[in-house]
Regions:
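A glycine-centered loop/beta-turn motif at secondary-structure junctions
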Residues: 160, 167-168, 175-195
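Cysteine-nucleophile active-site neighborhood
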Residues: 55-128
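Conserved beta-strand elements of the Class I
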Residues: 12-14, 149
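Extreme N-terminal starter segment of soluble prokaryotic enzymes
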Residues: 6-12
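An anion/phosphate-binding loop that grips the pyrophosphate of nucleotide cofactors and donors
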Residues: 47
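Pocket-forming structural segment of enzyme catalytic cores
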Residues: 96-175
């Protein structure tokens, strides 16, 4: 287990063995955030914000998250209305399950649905791509016409969550590579992006 002292007002990156935590930390620091890495559930729960990164196979990311009780920390944060951001496979594991190479792995189940392989002639989808964001998206405010960097072969390709008043509808942002897929979801305190 690892834990770097949480600086007051900071963001914790859940450290469960994912390969891109240092690049994520650097990006957040360049944006002015105070960043700490931790595999401790209590530290992840107490942070101002929690980042769930993810690189590699859905099953490996879930095994890593489960090994540090990350799912419980995420659930506790969301129950309390505290922000969580999932990136790449960190977004994918927020769905009910993922199917990769015939293996069906349970996810965290924050959203219904399955992550499957893109129906595209060239995989992985690697490079810059545009997105189709809602006009009132907070995440894409002022940058909706920009291009975003993707590296993936799997994604959530449909949205099945039905939300009824008085609850707000999640903001869904889509992209396309062979087939249409979710590029980002803004859902109360839970936000996730497929791009890096």
């Amino acid at each position: 287990r690892s834990s770097v002292a949480l600086k007051e007002g900071g963001i914790v990156i859940l450290d469960y063995g994912s390969g891109n935590i240092h690049s994520a930390a650097k990006a957040l620091e360049l944006a002015g955030a105070r960043v700490s890495l931790s595999s401790e559930k209590s530290v992840a729960e107490a942070a101002d914000g929690l980042l769930v990164p993810g690189v590699g196979a859905f099953s490996a990311v879930m095994a890593g998250i489960n090994s540090v009780r990350g799912g419980a920390a995420i659930e506790k944060r969301l129950t309390g209305g505290r922000p969580v951001l999932g990136i790449c496979v960190g977004m994918q594991v927020l769905f009910e399950h993922g199917v990769e190479r015939g293996n069906d792995t349970p996810g965290l189940g924050e959203w219904p649905g399955v992550v499957t392989q893109l129906d595209a002639p060239i995989l992985p989808h690697m490079g810059w791509n545009t997105v189709d964001a809602p006009a009132d998206s907070r995440l894409f405010s002022g940058i909706a016409d920009e291009r975003f960097y993707f590296v993936h072969s799997y994604a959530a390709q449909e949205w099945t969550l039905e939300v009824h008043d008085p609850f707000p509808q999640p903001q869904l942002t889509w992209a396309e590579h062979g087939s249409r897929f979710l590029a980002a979801v803004e859902n109360g305190p839970l936000t996730a992006t497929q791009f890096h």
